[in-house]
Structure formats: C-alpha cells, structure tokens
C-alpha cells in the first residue's frame, strides 16, 4: 500500500509539472503573438529635417515601446535624412531609412535589431575624377572612399583620382576644412566633384569672459585647450595635464606644495596666480586642479588685458575659463575612460655604500692632516667588514632610499559619463575616481568627483540651468614623516634596526650619537604616528537665459561655493632607544615624553550673483554686440584649531581622549570676510568681417580698502585686421584661410595680495606693564592703519598675429607683450624705537615683464587616420624696475634653513637666488700656499668649496654675507 501511495503522488507531481510547462508555453505564445501584432499594427508619425539616423530612432523609441540594438560603427551618423512620415507603420519607416544605407533590420518582439547588409559579389568598374574647391582650384590630398568599405584613394597634385568601385556604390569625398560630400556612382565614369568650405573651421567658437566669440574675430590674446588634448594624459590633476600646451603659461610644481600656474612671468612680489572661472563661477586653483579632465569640454586662457579686463581686479595675472560638458538632445550616451598604471621617479639619489663612505671619510681626514696617516677614521679591517657584511649589527651597509622608497607605485583613474535628453530637457552627469600613491611608502591619495549639469527650455524664450560639482580628496599617511634631509645625511654606516628588533644604536661598530639615533629615518617612518587630511569642494549653480527680443539675451546666475579642510594628526609616544652595545641602558634624548594630537578645520563659503544683458545686431556689413552687467560677491571664512597631549594609548583616534588642563590643552579660532560689488561691460564692432574693434570696462568696489580708495576702474581697448579678407588677398585664398593682425592695451588691478583688514590699525595683546606692585597685560598697536592702501595696477600691451593655412592644415599664433605692474605692495622695515612689530604695506614697487610667444599646430587626415602635432615656445624677461629707494630685500627659501636665499633688487628678476659663487674645490697646494679665504672663522681644507669674493680681499681674509651675489633665478627665461 505504501508503494502504491508513492506512485500516485509521483503521478500527481508529473501531471502538475506538465500543466505548468503547458501554461508557460501558452503565455509565451500569447506574448509572441502580442509582440508580433504590435509590430505589424503600431503606427507613428516621424518628422525629421536634415537630421540623422539617430534622430529617427529617438523619435520611434519615444512614441512606441520598441528598443533598438545596433553597432555604432556600422551606422553613418553624418548622413543627413529628411523624412515626413505621418501615421505610418514602424516597418514602413524602417524601410525608408535603411534602404540607402546598406542596412537591414529584424523585429523580434519589441526589439528592433539593425545590422549591416551582407556584402555579396558585385560588378565593379573603374572611375576617374577631379576634386576642386569653390574657386575651381584642385584640392591635393582629398580622401575618396567607397562608402561602407576600406576601398579608397587620395587625389594627386592636380586634384585627380582613379578608383575601382562597385556599381551603384556611394563615394565619400572629404578634406579637412571642407564639408564632406556623398557622390552616388552612376553609369558615367568621369566625376567632377566640388567641395564647399566648412564654415565651422573658421567659425570655431572660443569661450571668453561672460560669453563666447568666433576665434577669427578675437582681438585679444586667447588660447584654448580642448578635452581631447588632456583627458588621456596620465597626470591625475588638470594643472599638470595642461603643462606645455599653451605658450606663456608655466606650471610650477614644488615638493609638498600645490601645483600653481603662471602667465607671462612673475608680476609682483607676492602671488601671481590667475583667476579661475568654472562655468561662469569664480573658483580657485585647488578646485580647478582637482576637476575630472573627462568632465571638461574646453579651457580658455585669457592672457592680455583686452580679453581679461572684463574681470577687473581679479584678472591682473590672466584668467583661466573652464567649460564643463553639457547634455545634448538625443538618447542617453554612456562613456567610460580608465587608466591603471605604474609610475617611477625619473631620478633618485644614488647614495654611496658604507665601505665607500668609510674610504671617502678617510681620504677627507688625510687631506686635512696628512701627517696622521691614511686610516684616521676607519681601519682596513673595518672597511672589509662593511664590504663583506659579516657583522651587520656593527658594520652595516644601509641604503635609506631603498628602505623607505618604492621603485614603482600604483596609480589609477576612472571616469564614467552619462549625457542625453530631449529638446526640452538636457542632462550631463560625470563621475570620477583617482587613486594615487607616493614613492615613500604608506602615503596615498584618493579623489572623488561628481559633475551634474541640467538645462531645461521652459519656452522658446526662457531656459533654466542648474549644476552641482563636488570634489573630495583624502590623503592618508600611515606612520611618521621622516626628514628627507636625514635620508641623505645619515650615513650608510649607521644601523637602521638591530638584529634584536630594537632600533639602530650602532654606527661603525660604536654606539651612535643621540642625534643619529633620534634622526633614524626608518624609525621616524615606522612609528604609530598618522595623519588624515580631507578637502571637500562643492559648487552649486542656478541660472536662467531670457530672450524677450530676438537679439537680446538677459542672463542671471547665482553660485554658492563651499570649501572645507580637515586635518587630524597624531604624534605617538616614543621611548628612548636601548643601547645594543651596552644592554640595560638607553641612549638619552632619543624619545619623546608625551604623545599629542592636533585637529585643524577651515571652511570658507563664497556667494556670487551675476546679472547681465547682451544685445547683438547684424546689418549689412556691420555687426555690433553690447554686453552690460553687475555682480556681487561675499566671502566668509572660519578656522578652528585644537590640540591635546597625554593620551592613554596610541589606539585613541579622538581628541577627547587627551588631557584637558594646562598647557596640555590648547585651542583657537578665527573669522574673516570680504565683499565686492562690480559693474562690467563690453562692446564688439565688426566692419565687413575684416575690421574688428573691442572695448571692455570694469569697475570694482572692495571692502578690503578704505572708503576713499574702494573703487577701481579697469578699461581695455583692442583692434584687429583680418588681412586675409581684403580683396588684394584673393589670389592667395587657396593657401591662406585666415591672417589676422591684432593689437591691444588695457589696465587691470590686483587684489590677491591685499588682506581683508590690511588698512585697519592692528593691536596685539602681548607683554606686561608693572603698575606699583601689580602686573597688567598690555594691548598695544602692532601695525598702524594705512587708509591710502590701494589696488596694484597692471598695464599690458600686446601685439599679435594669427594665421591658418592650407585649409586648416597649419595654424599658428605669435605675440609680443609688455606688462608693467605698478603700485605693488611692499612693507618697509620700521625702526625698533617705534614699538611697531609689523609695518603697513604701501603701494610703491614696480615690475616689468616682456616677452615673445609663438605656437604652431599641424592637423591632417590620411585615410581614416587623423592626427595633430603642436609645438610652442615663449620667452620672458622679468625685471624689478623700482623698489622706491628701499634696500635689497632678502628672504630665506621655503625650506627654512636660511642657507639659500631669495633677493629682491632693482634691475634684477623676481625669484633671484642670492648665494655664494663658487670656483671649484680647494687643492692641497692652494692651502699650503695660503691662497684661500676663510668662512665662518674656519680655515678651509683641501676639498672644501672655493667661494669667490665679490669685493677686494687679501688671501686669508674672511668671506661674509657681503660676498653673496645673484647665482640664478627660479623664473625661466623661456619655456617650450
């Protein structure tokens, strides 16, 4: 009975399974029938005028449930389609758009698959022809290709070609600077093909201040870089990526410092940073440098006063205009760009090994005192112990570079972009990620990018725009930061770590000094120290474009930019290092008695409002454009600092775990703000497309100045002459596409070196006075007020020539400029008797920059391969012309050692190095003959540097600071 019951259950399960399968098959059949019926009966209307295949597909998908699948390389996106299908079957529309494109389609359910028509054997024939331009001149090197194949040729010196093609095929004829033309092969065998000039080649639009202009109509010095030129570079920041792409623009990179940019030399005694503008909003170098290059559409560099005066007091040292990518009408496009790589330093210090060090040390001692013999420092036995490595605890061979640096480190960057939209709504979204490691171990940086742009055409005359940009950069350091000087100074004869696991305490078989032990680079690196640094940059924009009249556009934009910096650093407790040679004892002074943590936080916000109106009018041979606008800026900044010591253990990562009393607990804060209000305007006038005139004006009022000096006015004027458009150049138009001469002059202001409260009187609360038996804290004047403080001024003259030859194959620019900066802020030394610790800055110094710039670009297409080669060179002569009778100003280099110095001196360049000139090394013969100079009260030995005096000295007299001279300059004379 049990077996029968099991059989019945099994039979029941089989029946159930069969019923389920049958039901599924029925449902599938119904779905297929439904899909087929949908494909056969669904009607839509499609209207496309001078559109593309993609425009038709987009309309079908919007009006139906169909989804298209195809390979983009099989679709000719350039072919123009004119279609007006009303209430047509989808299949009828598909027949129409595929019949002349060598395409076929297949409907599967609600999926439409477009494929290339299989090529069958066809009858071929030979055709010949000539390709000319609109003036009948032959075009040399034009491409003639049979559509859909790799079969093609190029025209000869007379513009002629011959080609064997299939009957009823289509020829694609193209040449740079001309519109591509499709020619259908008919029964004839001779073809005369005339190409029309591509107006876009000369109508290239360049982003300028508060707008765009045709490149050929520019009268100022403007250079532009497209995303294609930088997006594939391996550098992880934008500033490094543009190095070498623009003449006169120099990228300055120093270890431990942010990368900076310099236009046409150093213009003053402080910072010469340009203004950064991203999608119309003012930004800074940090924001710009950390943008994702794959989200950038173009970068314009405004280098002269004519192009940058409209930004007034912020544009004294140029303007960098960034335009990010925007959405376009059409189906969503997804693009990805990624790079994973390894990097290595081009040069690392080649340190001598321990036995070489010992031999050189012996040689130096012998040169100092030959009578003491040749092994004054190390015996031959000790040198052999270094060499054979049999006693590494006593006679090591330590290579500090190998211990702390990696030969290769990883770097990677990824970008993912989405764009698309409809005629009413367009969007672009870009995501970016960068991971980069340093050559010193356990140092890494991560960067995250978001760029979102949305535009909506509410009506034909009103468009709203919005964008969000967000950047986060995290830099983590796991372990301490060894002194780079120690890596080079601590000799290879010092043990990094003993075999017992303790830190090195032996140098050349002897107990090392506390200085060596405390400066052990490996120990400094391997501690429980750590630091975490985070920078968050965000920008939010809302704007509109209103067109109340045909030629009038009113634009408004509001921007809020936020910057937040957070840094937390911990210094761990370190015990004194135990002695390896004297167990049970320690080497004093090699540890620290307490641990500590410090937190720094800084946030600033920048709010801007801009409103402007632009009116354009073209009538007959006249073209006029007028721009007028206002802007308002408000900057606010807050900082906080807190530190504590005496943490219970290294595992604590929060400040609250530290001590809360006395000197073990500190904090501080600051706040500041400024405001600016501005008027600006521009007039462009063009006569007969050959005579160009432009005038810019800006008036800025800044809270950084006293009321009487608050306003600054900055005009510029420029003119251009398109020589190529003159009638007498007609015979040269087959060679010269564009030849333009331009000249400009303008004045700009600089506010970057002015503090928010520099014109105020400053007080400090340091020091005490005694009144009878009572001590009272004193508040005293530390810096007098300076109500006359005003703008630094820049006057810039530029003469330039632009040319495009052979239909854009060769193009270039040449410029000569003179930039005079006056009223540069300079603080005089104040006598100590005044009791003033800080002198107020005054507008007194002057600097001049002069130079040439030249850039050349070659573009060409060979077959299906397009390429571009460019080169540029720029010279710059920088000179301090006036320090207002002030003495030379000498400053230490940023390393703080006070050895190498900068000097500011009239007639010399900013950034001049002030040091001792040397003439090789002293020989023993010179020392014996007394032909030497002392330095620091010390008589030199053979092998010491031979300093050259800059005044009359007798042998044996002392070299002093009076013998320093200019030995170089950090500002290059030319770049290329």
What is the predicted function of each stretch?
Residues 1-451, 458, 463-465, 512, ...:
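Short, small/polar-rich motifs associated with maturation and membrane association
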Residues 36-38, 130-134, 145, 155, ...:
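Well-ordered, non-transmembrane segments within structured domains
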Residues 204, 285, 651, 774, ...:
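Coil residues (strongly favoring Ser/Thr
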Residues 215-216, 310-312, 330-331, 345-347, ...:
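Switch/connector loops and helix/strand junctions flanking conserved nucleotide-binding motifs
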Residues 230, 266, 273, 447, ...:
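Extracellular/periplasmic, surface-exposed regions of secreted and cell-surface proteins
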Residues 335-392, 641, 861-974:
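Conserved small-residue
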Residues 486-487:
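Acidic, Ser/Thr-rich peripheral helices and adjacent loops at domain boundaries
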Residues 497-510, 732:
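Outer-membrane beta-barrel biogenesis signature
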